[in-house]
Amino acid sequence: MGNARKILIIDDDDELRDSLSEQLSLHEEFDTMLAANASDGLKLARNGHVDLVLLDVGLPDLDGREACKLLRRSGFKGPVVMLTGQASDADTILGLESGANDYVTKPFKLGVLLARIRAQLRQHEQSEDAVFTIGPYTFKPASKLLVDSGGG
């Protein structure tokens, strides 16, 4: 799936993580990468091309909001959608202020999550931070650059 959007799912709930991966993979537009904790997720985000991150707030090794801040500091520009069991306005504000683009409360309907993922990806593609991979090339429309992955 060369044009599939890479979604990184960082959640310590094995069942939810695997179920989300399975459901997203049914849609040919998505390809998933999985991590059970923040440190593994941050490594995957830094080392691979990731289009969007689904990030649980309650991770075993680090609060998801702190993980989001670290993602942003490391240069990740793509959308981050926080997943949480806490529905208060204060939690939503903390999540968005940590650098998240959206905040989804568990339990959620898959159709709603899919719509939010697609909306975030559409919005990001129109931003100055958008980067598209075309075969061995990386295209940065805002700076009008087409870069060969070999460095040229």
Segments and roles (model prediction):
Residues 104, 108-117:
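C-terminal output helix
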Residues 34-52:
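Acidic, metal-coordinating helix/loop segments flanking the phosphotransfer/catalytic sites
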Residues 14-33:
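Two-component/phosphorelay signaling modules centered on CheY-like receiver
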Residues 133-152:
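A structural micro-motif at secondary-structure boundaries
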Residues 17, 60, 88:
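The feature encodes the CheY-like receiver
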Residues 11, 56, 84:
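Active-site residues of response regulator receiver
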